[in-house]
């Protein structure tokens, strides 16, 4: 089995690669895990992981420039697919960041957290939302196996998903209001948080993906 981590020059790729390889060992899978910016090699993979880090306009431009946008669209149709952070945001119709169109797999927009956010005690919250936060699983999913409700994951983001269809929301967090942080549809699963930075919980989720 081959799992491709898409390399379009935008993301914490070697950290993702290391985490996915560790997850493969935990899963006991004989799986080849590799970075690739080659659309043909991505198209031959059995599973695809789509990380991303940085500004969405830059990520979308890099993806298109490398000819990987069509490979991603094809993978979304028929392969187990995991989007991470900006890689997840790129799956939506549109982002407020740079007024950027995405790939349109999920209906909805990516919105910026408002300025002057306050926590329940009236203290100012910083944007970007950075650090550990609990995640509520709002639906059952195979990738949640072995992960308790309200497990903490690691976030770094100024923008968040606003899906059109609430049935695609699989998990939520609060900052300070609830926002979608996991979405899924058919063969596609995507998280706003960084699984590769989320220690045991992130490794378990990646292991579940390799077993999916």
From Swiss-Prot:
Location(s), subcellular: Cytoplasm
Biological processes per GO annotation: L-histidine biosynthetic process
One GO CC term, this protein: cytoplasm
This protein's UniProt keywords: Amino-acid biosynthesis, Cytoplasm, Glutamine amidotransferase, Histidine biosynthesis, Hydrolase, Lyase
Catalytic reaction(s) noted: 5-[(5-phospho-1-deoxy-D-ribulos-1-ylimino)methylamino]-1-(5-phospho-beta-D-ribosyl)imidazole-4-carboxamide + L-glutamine = D-erythro-1-(imidazol-4-yl)glycerol 3-phosphate + 5-amino-1-(5-phospho-beta-D-ribosyl)imidazole-4-carboxamide + L-glutamate + H(+); L-glutamine + H2O = L-glutamate + NH4(+)
UniProt gene name: hisH
Residue ranges of domain Glutamine amidotransferase type-1 in the record: 2-212
Subunit description: Heterodimer of HisH and HisF.
EC number annotated for this UniProt entry: 4.3.2.10, 3.5.1.2
The protein, known as: Imidazole glycerol phosphate synthase subunit HisH
């Amino acid at each position: 089995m081959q799992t491709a981590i898409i390399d379009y020059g935008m993301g914490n790729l070697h950290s993702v690669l290391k985490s996915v390889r560790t997850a493969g060992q935990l899963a006991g899978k004989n799986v080849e895990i590799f970075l690739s910016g080659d659309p043909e090699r991505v198209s031959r993979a059995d599973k695809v992981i789509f990380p991303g880090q940085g500004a969405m306009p830059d990520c979308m431009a890099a993806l298109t420039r490398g000819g990987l946008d069509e490979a991603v669209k094809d993978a979304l149709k028929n392969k187990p697919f995991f989007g991470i952070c900006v890689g997840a945001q790129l799956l939506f119709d549109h982002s407020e960041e740079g007024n950027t169109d995405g790939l349109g797999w999920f209906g909805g927009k990516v919105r910026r957290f408002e300025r002057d956010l306050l926590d329940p005690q009236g203290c100012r919250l910083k944007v970007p939302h950075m650090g550990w936060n609990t995640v509520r699983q709002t639906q059952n999913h195979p990738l949640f196996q072995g992960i308790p409700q309200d497990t903490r994951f690691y976030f770094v983001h100024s923008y968040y998903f606003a899906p059109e269809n609430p049935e695609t929301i699989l998990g939520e967090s609060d900052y300070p209001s609830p926002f979608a942080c996991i979405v899924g549809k058919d063969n596609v699963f995507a998280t706003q948080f960084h699984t590769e930075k989320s220690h045991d919980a992130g490794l378990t989720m990646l292991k579940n993906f390799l077993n999916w």
